[in-house]
């Protein structure tokens, strides 16, 4: 028994060390100017590097078009479970996005996260710069996916951190934050991880697969938080707060922090503006879920627009597999009649490839497709 326990401890230590090494090596993003400070300068026009559209074609669908709404309490109640599970299945197959109400995350935990996040972005630049991204890292204060000095930039600043597992936290980031902010991240991250696993379990049931086959990929996985700050812009129609893309990870849970809207979802060739419901989360499926379900569910492009007069804040929680896990179609979706549509590679390989490229629609997922 003693030898077995020592072996388990050694394996656990080796896994942690491997995860730490691989998470440090997955990517980098170049340092860029701080947009919040640019906006404070009362610019008459946008600097050229931020101009993405001179004549923007941005077809929005009628205001009555909205992403579906799913009720978590209805999923948990036996009398409404079947109907709500069917609604969830339709939302995932037809939209890849939905709002989740009655989700069970404590209101106080959500409000504390909003407050601490706002206070962080209100800090003087020199204080925020203590948490800036280093030249060889994707985490910290700055912009992600900046891979060249010629690349167009988003009209936004962000603060990205790995929140779970705690042993992957960079010592100069979350541990150095003010205690109230650390506590907010701890409580918020823990409750969102629990919520995400529940959602994935229900998705598995809707798909007719073993729920464990789905949740096992994510239960010990990596949760990352990205806090987004979109300053007011003098020419909002010419820039992107976040350029069109699909999320590369597993499941994304977004919380709107203030009342300013900006998220848009691609649907039927146009863009659907999302009007967040009070206290709801916005859930979207990432590329990894499209791969795992062999295309039964799919990720969807979305973008963030900015406001001419007001700032917008949001925080996204991303749930991904462990770095040593394989990412590929689950066995439930492969048969002689239905071959694999995507390659199988390790999560470490997957994310290294992702972070070496600029965000561009679903182009990275396309690289994972098996060409027949």
From Swiss-Prot:
Record-linked PROSITE patterns: FE2OG_OXY (PS51471)
A matching Pfam family: 2OG-FeII_Oxy
GO terms (BP aspect): coumarin biosynthetic process; response to molecule of fungal origin
Originating species: Ocimum basilicum
Binding annotation for 2-oxoglutarate: 312
Stored Gene3D superfamilies: B-lactam Antibiotic, Isopenicillin N Synthase, Chain (2.60.120.330)
Residues that, per the record, bind Fe cation: 245, 247, 302
Cellular component aspect of the GO annotation: cytoplasm
Name of this protein: Oxoglutarate-dependent flavonoid 7-O-demethylase 1
Subunit details: Monomer.
EC annotation from Swiss-Prot or TrEMBL: 1.14.13.-
């Amino acid at each position: 028994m003693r030898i077995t326990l020592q072996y388990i401890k050694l394996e656990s230590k080796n896994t942690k060390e491997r995860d730490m090494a691989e998470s440090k090596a997955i990517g980098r993003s170049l340092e860029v100017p701080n947009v919040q400070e640019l906006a404070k300068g009362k610019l008459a026009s946008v600097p050229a590097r931020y101009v993405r559209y001179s004549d923007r074609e941005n077809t929005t669908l009628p205001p009555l078009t909205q992403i579906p709404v799913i009720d978590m309490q209805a999923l948990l109640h036996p009398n409404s479970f079947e109907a709500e599970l069917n609604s969830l299945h339709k939302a995932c197959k037809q939209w890849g996005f939905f709002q989740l109400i009655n989700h069970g995350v404590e209101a106080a935990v959500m409000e504390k996260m909003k407050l601490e996040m706002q206070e962080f972005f209100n800090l003087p630049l020199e204080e925020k710069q203590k948490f800036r991204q280093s030249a060889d890292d994707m985490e910290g204060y700055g912009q992600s996916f900046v891979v060249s000095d010629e690349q167009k930039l988003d009209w936004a600043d962000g603060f990205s951190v790995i929140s779970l597992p705690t042993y992957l936290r960079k010592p100069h980031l979350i541990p150095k934050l003010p205690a109230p902010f650390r506590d907010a991240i701890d409580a918020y991250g823990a409750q969102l991880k629990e919520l995400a696993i529940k959602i994935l379990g229900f998705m598995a049931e809707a798909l007719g697969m073993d729920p464990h086959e789905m949740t096992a990929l994510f239960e010990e996985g990596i949760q990352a938080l990205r806090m987004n700050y979109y300053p007011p812009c003098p020419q909002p129609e010419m820039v992107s707060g976040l350029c069109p893309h699909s999320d590369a990870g597993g499941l994304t849970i977004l919380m709107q922090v203030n009342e300013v809207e900006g998220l848009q979802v691609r649907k039927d060739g146009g863009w659907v503006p999302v009007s967040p419901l009070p206290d709801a989360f916005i859930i979207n499926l990432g590329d990894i879920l499209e791969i795992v379900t062999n295309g039964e569910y799919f990720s969807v492009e979305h973008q963030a627009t900015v406001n001419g007069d007001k700032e917008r804040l949001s925080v996204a929680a991303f749930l991904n597999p462990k770095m040593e896990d394989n990412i590929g179609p689950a066995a439930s979706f492969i048969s002689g009649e239905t071959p694999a549509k995507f390659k199988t590679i390790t999560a470490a390989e997957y994310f290294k490839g992702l972070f070496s490229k600029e965000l561009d629609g679903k182009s990275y997922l396309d690289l994972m497709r098996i060409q027949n």
